Amino acid sequence: MNSKNHHQKKRFGQHWLVNKKILEKIKEIAVLNQNDFILEIGPGKGALTSKLLDSEIKKLHAIELDKDLINLLNDKFNNNDKFSLQQGDILTVNLDSINKKITKVIANIPYNITGPILDIFIGRLGITRNYNYEKIIFLMQKDVVDRILSKEGSPNAGALSVRMQLLSKIKKICDVPPSSFSPPPKVFSSLVVFEPIKNHLRLDISIEKNIDKLLRISFNSRRKMLRNTLNSILSNEEINELSESSKVCFNLRPQDISIEQWIKLAENCIKIKK
């Protein structure tokens, strides 16, 4: 199939990156080397794939959902020994055979699957990862990136920001306008780099699980004070004890609590419930 004859499919959320400067920027921040095993999610017509394969990498494995693009990609890259292609849905595909080989993940994420993609590749609190990615480079919706990077006191602060910041080091590289894509989306995107925190450097799994539980309960009613949300799992006596031992005011709303305070709350909650 000629690439010019392929039209994007709305159901796949296809907005292909065509801005050459951003394509080059992704390659630059990936800091590729001869030991890198790259996983590219949704290569589309292969614009970024070409850039990445032009580097001294060990392997690039691409996963593409759109069956109509498979022959196009194979025709384009089948003479490159570093390239392999798999047709499938990244949300359900089994990566067990290559997961421990992958060093870097690169993707222009369809907006409609951002949440599940973050769960799979950045991870979830209380669950040990079975991979060791050095770097994850995502081009994703700007307002989601802004929420992820939010600090306490910001109206954008939420469970997502606490979870992502506990699981990885995050750096926003730049914002990307709709005109950088074909067809242009309705919103701005951001280029962001995640460096997952190694399992042995993460918090104790029991603490992570407690943080996740506290976040879920608190942010389900984000306009309420902590005192009025956590009373579903704690008595008034326990709330007062937890507030005092953690040095956290329970008259605050969840978006005003810092990550360090969430950690203290989880640690002391475990002690109180023993």
Swiss-Prot record:
<dbReference type="GO" id="GO:0003723">
    <property type="term" value="F:RNA binding"/>
</dbReference>
<feature type="binding site">
    <location>
        <position position="17"/>
    </location>
    <ligand>
        <name>S-adenosyl-L-methionine</name>
    </ligand>
</feature>
<keyword id="KW-0698">rRNA processing</keyword>
<dbReference type="InterPro" id="IPR023165">
    <property type="entry name" value="rRNA_Ade_diMease-like_C"/>
</dbReference>
<keyword id="KW-0963">Cytoplasm</keyword>
<keyword id="KW-0949">S-adenosyl-L-methionine</keyword>
<feature type="binding site">
    <location>
        <position position="89"/>
    </location>
    <ligand>
        <name>S-adenosyl-L-methionine</name>
    </ligand>
</feature>
<feature type="binding site">
    <location>
        <position position="15"/>
    </location>
    <ligand>
        <name>S-adenosyl-L-methionine</name>
    </ligand>
</feature>
<dbReference type="InterPro" id="IPR011530">
    <property type="entry name" value="rRNA_adenine_dimethylase"/>
</dbReference>
<comment type="function">
    <text>Specifically dimethylates two adjacent adenosines (A1518 and A1519) in the loop of a conserved hairpin near the 3'-end of 16S rRNA in the 30S particle. May play a critical role in biogenesis of 30S subunits.</text>
</comment>
<keyword id="KW-0694">RNA-binding</keyword>
<feature type="binding site">
    <location>
        <position position="108"/>
    </location>
    <ligand>
        <name>S-adenosyl-L-methionine</name>
    </ligand>
</feature>
<keyword id="KW-0489">Methyltransferase</keyword>
<dbReference type="InterPro" id="IPR029063">
    <property type="entry name" value="SAM-dependent_MTases_sf"/>
</dbReference>
<dbReference type="InterPro" id="IPR020598">
    <property type="entry name" value="rRNA_Ade_methylase_Trfase_N"/>
</dbReference>
<keyword id="KW-0808">Transferase</keyword>
<feature type="binding site">
    <location>
        <position position="64"/>
    </location>
    <ligand>
        <name>S-adenosyl-L-methionine</name>
    </ligand>
</feature>
<dbReference type="GO" id="GO:0005829">
    <property type="term" value="C:cytosol"/>
</dbReference>
<feature type="binding site">
    <location>
        <position position="42"/>
    </location>
    <ligand>
        <name>S-adenosyl-L-methionine</name>
    </ligand>
</feature>
<dbReference type="GO" id="GO:0052908">
    <property type="term" value="F:16S rRNA (adenine(1518)-N(6)/adenine(1519)-N(6))-dimethyltransferase activity"/>
</dbReference>
<dbReference type="InterPro" id="IPR020596">
    <property type="entry name" value="rRNA_Ade_Mease_Trfase_CS"/>
</dbReference>
<dbReference type="InterPro" id="IPR001737">
    <property type="entry name" value="KsgA/Erm"/>
</dbReference>
<dbReference type="Pfam" id="PF00398">
    <property type="entry name" value="RrnaAD"/>
</dbReference>
<protein>
    <recommendedName>
        <fullName>Ribosomal RNA small subunit methyltransferase A</fullName>
        <ecNumber>2.1.1.182</ecNumber>
    </recommendedName>
</protein>
<comment type="similarity">
    <text>Belongs to the class I-like SAM-binding methyltransferase superfamily. rRNA adenine N(6)-methyltransferase family. RsmA subfamily.</text>
</comment>
